[in-house]
Regions:
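Iron-sulfur cluster-binding electron-transfer modules in prokaryotic oxidoreductases
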Residues: 1-179
Length: 179
């Protein structure tokens, strides 16, 4: 299941469209999760910490029923949903309390793997396959990777790459032919 998030539906529509076209060119699809809601990243001032997790848990539960993989593209959504998933898996008391909000038919059992689109490209499709399908290589272009503060940290939860010496973006950029 693909979780686009609010930003990709408003201010970053081009990124969403590009990711979808790239997935199709690579023989895959980004099947959008139905009836998704904001990940909850905008709710940090809520007095009820667990209520801030409900949107993410609803997405995790829907993905669990739909194959067990949730793909994100927005770094903020990825961070919020992945940290929520970690909480639901590793804190049974809080997980139960969150699931009580949702009800028995919508409870989340912890069976969703959250992946950033870059992880899908690296681990499922492979960067070699990406390189083989590039139609307009970026040869001679120097592109700097920017990870920001949300994609890799906290490292024990995100587990996407080495937070001190990441390579995933550089390897992706190389697969496109750039330096």
């Amino acid at each position: 299941s693909y979780y686009p998030g609010c930003t990709l539906k408003t201010q970053a529509k081009e990124l969403d469209a590009s990711a979808r076209r790239a997935a199709e060119a690579l023989g895959s699809t980004l099947d959008e999760l139905e009836n998704w809601q904001c990940c909850g990243g905008v709710y940090p001032t809520s007095r009820d910490e667990l209520a801030t997790k409900l949107s993410s848990v609803r997405a995790l539960a829907a993905a669990e029923k739909n194959g067990g993989i949730l793909v994100t593209l927005c770094s903020a959504c990825h961070n919020v949903i992945k940290q929520t998933n970690d909480l639901m898996i590793n804190d049974p008391e809080k997980a139960q309390r969150v699931n009580n909000y949702l009800g028995p038919d919508d409870a989340y059992g912890g069976g969703t793997k959250v992946m950033h689109y870059l992880e899908v490209l690296r681990d499922e499709i492979t960067f070699d396959a990406v390189a083989e399908r590039v139609t307009a290589p970026l040869n001679g272009k120097k592109i700097a990777a920017y990870y920001g503060c949300l994609l890799l940290r906290p490292g024990k939860v995100m587990q996407m790459d080495d937070p001190e010496n990441p390579r995933i973006m550089e390897d992706f950029i190389s697969s496109l032919g750039a330096d």
